[in-house]
Amino acid sequence: MMKYDHILVRYGEMTTKGKNRSKFVSTLKDNVKFKLKKFPNIKINATHDRMYIELNGEDHEAIAESLKDVFGIHKFNLAMKVPSELEEIKKGALAAFLLIKKPVKTFKITVHRSYKHFPMQTMELLPEIGGYVLENTEDIMVDVHNPDVNIRIEIRSGYSYIMCDERMGAGGLPVGVGGKVMVLLSGGIDSPVAAYLTMKRGVSVEAVHFHSPPFTSERAKQKVIDLAQELTKYCKRVTLHLVPFTEVQKTINKEIPSSYTMTVMRRMMMRITERIAEERNALAITTGESLGQVASQTLDSMHTINEVTNYPVLRPLITMDKLEIIKIANEIGTYDISIRPYEDCCTVFTPANPATKPKREKASRFEAKYDFTPLLEQAVANTETMVLQTVDKAEEDQFEDLF
């Protein structure tokens, strides 16, 4: 029985990039190669308009499952490559149709003849191929307007592609074409979604997490590591910077009026993140803030917090409500990790009545009464950095079985 031997990838938004298109295509090819490195027999050919993945016996479903998380892919088709001969095309169309797993009652044939010397015209091919499918199936009808399946055939010189199983890609742009940002990764629901949406725009991310032992536990730290690990599904790797924040936070709570401790804490986080960003050649800072969600996420708060950094602060979730954010978190696999009941440093020292309209002048005046510089430098110097890469699910299961 014939089976899929190719996957054809369509780029989507990348096609609008003009002179930079070759860079985008090259980056996408590198990302796909990295994502599919566990399939040693495949061959990848990335052209100006499309990417062709030759399977060479590898499992098409496993490859399709990996491809769906690669940013820069609009859609992809499971395909068969057959000689450009009528009988072979007919057999291929039937075989592709029979591989469809969902219930199908109607179909249509679409033919694109880029090889104009093929001996039959498109309007001659449609009934010929469609009739062959009808003759060899039962309870199936042709519906050219709203079919359950569209059997698409591309006829070229020497060979043709036949496809009818179309899958959606992740969309966006290839990770790596848009520079690098530092993402404040708290361990909550919002910040992993912000990281995901930032990567979707082609930006590489490194994560910064502030932890305050013994007020925050090792389990809370592991939760953030697991979140960063989950995000590697969408890129080659995530570098995670774990910043010890205990002394800074204790000093803030001692020296700063309680209504401003949250604001000053955020300002200190921004200062530390900016220093790490400078060392790592990042160009911006991403946060998971959503306008009005909590006291520290009002416009006044953001205005006051932004004062301490010259870096652009990206807020992908700024107009989303909580349910929209949770929906994405569920889709990308971070929600169940985020809701593990472990405290982070933003919640263990939460004041009873935080200022919702903090002023820059007040925050600066409160900070000026104590020299925080040595504490910030110590936090940066003692930051632990780890690099996380995608773990194959089968390998992960095998590892867990050892215990």
Swiss-Prot record:
InterPro entries named among the record's database cross-references: Rossmann-like_a/b/a_fold, ThiI_AANH, ThiI_fer, ThiI_N, THUMP_dom, THUMP_ThiI, tRNA_STrfase, tRNA_sulfurtransferase_ThiI
Keyword annotations from UniProtKB, A to Z: ATP-binding, Cytoplasm, Nucleotide-binding, RNA-binding, Thiamine biosynthesis, Transferase, tRNA-binding
ATP-binding listed as a keyword: yes
Enzyme Commission designation: 2.8.1.4
Any one Gene Ontology molecular-function term assigned to this protein's record: CCA tRNA nucleotidyltransferase activity
Pfam families the UniProt entry points to: ThiI, ThiI_fer, THUMP
Binding residues for ATP: 184-185, 209-210, 266, 288, 297
UniProt xrefs under SUPFAM superfamilies: Adenine nucleotide alpha hydrolases-like (SSF52402), THUMP domain-like (SSF143437)
Compartments where located: Cytoplasm
GO process annotations (BP): thiamine biosynthetic process; thiamine diphosphate biosynthetic process; thiazole biosynthetic process; tRNA 4-thiouridine biosynthesis
Pathway(s): Cofactor biosynthesis; thiamine diphosphate biosynthesis
Catalytic activity: [ThiI sulfur-carrier protein]-S-sulfanyl-L-cysteine + a uridine in tRNA + 2 reduced [2Fe-2S]-[ferredoxin] + ATP + H(+) = [ThiI sulfur-carrier protein]-L-cysteine + a 4-thiouridine in tRNA + 2 oxidized [2Fe-2S]-[ferredoxin] + AMP + diphosphate; [ThiS sulfur-carrier protein]-C-terminal Gly-Gly-AMP + S-sulfanyl-L-cysteinyl-[cysteine desulfurase] + AH2 = [ThiS sulfur-carrier protein]-C-terminal-Gly-aminoethanethioate + L-cysteinyl-[cysteine desulfurase] + A + AMP + 2 H(+)
One GO term describing the cellular component: cytosol
Domain named THUMP: residues: 61-166
Gene3D superfamilies listed in its UniProt record: 3.30.2130.30, HUPs
Source organism, top-level taxon: Bacteria
Record's function text: Catalyzes the ATP-dependent transfer of a sulfur to tRNA to produce 4-thiouridine in position 8 of tRNAs, which functions as a near-UV photosensor. Also catalyzes the transfer of sulfur to the sulfur carrier protein ThiS, forming ThiS-thiocarboxylate. This is a step in the synthesis of thiazole, in the thiamine biosynthesis pathway. The sulfur is donated as persulfide by IscS.
Similarity-based family: Belongs to the ThiI family.
PANTHER family found in the cross-reference section: TRNA SULFURTRANSFERASE
Protein name: Probable tRNA sulfurtransferase
Source organism of the structure: Bacillus cytotoxicus (strain DSM 22905 / CIP 110041 / 391-98 / NVH 391-98)
Originating gene: thiI
